Amino acid sequence: MKMPKDKPHVNIVFIGHVDHGKSTTIGRLLYDTGNIPEQIIKKFEEMGEKGKSFKFAWVMDRLREERERGITIDVAHTKFETPHRYITIIDAPGHRDFVKNMITGASQADAAVLVVAATDGVMPQTKEHAFLARTLGIKHIIVAINKMDMVNYNQKRFEEVKAQVEKLLKMLGYKDFPVIPISAWEGENVVKKSDKMPWYNGPTLIEALDQIPEPEKPVDKPLRIPIQDVYSIKGVGTVPVGRVETGKLRVGEVVIFEPASTIFHKPIQGEVKSIEMHHEPLEEALPGDNIGFNVRGVSKNDIKRGDVAGHTTNPPTVVRTKDTFKAQIIVLNHPTAITVGYSPVLHAHTAQVPVRFEQLLAKLDPKTGNIVEENPQFIKTGDAAIVILRPMKPVVLEPVKEIPQLGRFAIRDMGMTIAAGMVISIQRGE
């Protein structure tokens, strides 16, 4: 008997303007695939509504109540299956830490579903989220034009909104994305094919999700393992834990940790004696593997969360305090304006370090990436910009063109994500 090949796992995020129906679309996908969160089903049973049918509207009301009480039902990390994919919905941007989570790799999205209401068309947040998806390196986008029931399933209106979205996404460099007319509330074209729109012959939303290309593993890039934790295990020694972002690690190879080696002015390195994943020994770890690995001659106090392991032949790139790096950022949320001298905290992979804005080189049009102003005095919410940043402590960062997983970052201050960005290049100071 042949075992079916394991289906690829794909992470998706839902983006789009507030009130365009992200939650309803997620709710409909889960409802129609039989994956409503456990606590909602429990609640239904507790309320003794046995006789009544478990209606979609009721489910959405419960989800909304939970949200208003400040509990986002973990639609974050809700899983469902399509014929060829295991799909995890990793987040929807109502979540405060959406951007931070996406950048720090708590949840690397393979694709985004951009929800646009047929009634409103493209709105400011539609543009911002689309630009953000690109900044975060999301390669595939599926467009769901929702609320078709509110425009009487009118083809002309669909074509108008489709044209707006296509213009926006093409400017951002996206090609070949499906644009699907849906009504999440009525359940049209989400999981079940709609008979209300005979003029549309493309895929349903779930069919489009089933066709998301399988994420490729960057095994040919240099090894990079951002460290999440370090354990000291009796009889074994020091065991750093982290997810392999790029490259591969084999037992017997020598790894070096940065910025630890830079900070201690001596190589913090050693031979890998063993690798474990889910308590099983591994000879070789690949991108996406969450591993613990035992390193000879490295003590628990030498390394910490935020360090990155790489091979001694191609060590992780350290940006020191005398260095700077050039970055492209999008300001998502700042109460006033950002000027030179602003010093928030940079979050990249598992590291967090204070940084200082040294220069504001240019303000960009978020849609086209074209420069609209050289050396602006300040930048504010909604602006995209090229800036020079200086870390106040050494940190591992890589240019996004070389190792994207270590080239993206979030900027946080006052408990919020202020900006998202990517490293363009690193300038060495003397």
From Swiss-Prot:
InterPro entries: EFTu-like_2, G_TR_CS, GTP-eEF1A_C, P-loop_NTPase, Small_GTP-bd, T_Tr_GTP-bd_dom, TRAFAC_GTPase_members, Transl_B-barrel_sf
Binding-site list for GTP: 16-23, 91-95, 146-149
Location(s), subcellular: Cytoplasm
Keywords: Cytoplasm, Elongation factor, GTP-binding, Hydrolase, Magnesium, Metal-binding, Nucleotide-binding, Protein biosynthesis
SUPFAM superfamilies: EF-Tu/eEF-1alpha/eIF2-gamma C-terminal domain, P-loop containing nucleoside triphosphate hydrolases, Translation proteins
Stated name of the protein: Elongation factor 1-alpha
Chief location category: cytoplasm
Gene that this polypeptide is encoded by: tuf
Record region (G4): 146-149
Role this protein plays: GTP hydrolase that promotes the GTP-dependent binding of aminoacyl-tRNA to the A-site of ribosomes during protein biosynthesis.
Annotated catalysed reactions: GTP + H2O = GDP + phosphate + H(+)
Top-level taxon in the UniProt lineage: Archaea
CC annotations in GO: cytoplasm
Organism in which the protein naturally occurs: Pyrococcus woesei
NCBIfam families from the UniProt entry: EF-1_alpha, PRK12317.1, small_GTP
Region entry G5, spans: 183-185
Region described as G3: spans on this chain: 91-94
Annotated family: Belongs to the TRAFAC class translation factor GTPase superfamily. Classic translation factor GTPase family. EF-Tu/EF-1A subfamily.
PROSITE patterns with a match to the protein in the record: G_TR_1, G_TR_2
Annotated segments matching region G2: 70-74
Pfam families reported for this sequence: GTP-eEF1A_C (PF22594), GTP_EFTU (PF00009), GTP_EFTU_D2 (PF03144)
Enzyme Commission number(s) from the entry: 3.6.5.3
GO molecular function terms listed in the Swiss-Prot or TrEMBL record: GTP binding; GTPase activity; translation elongation factor activity
CDD domains xrefs: EF1_alpha, EF1_alpha_II, EF1_alpha_III
Region of interest: G1: 16-23
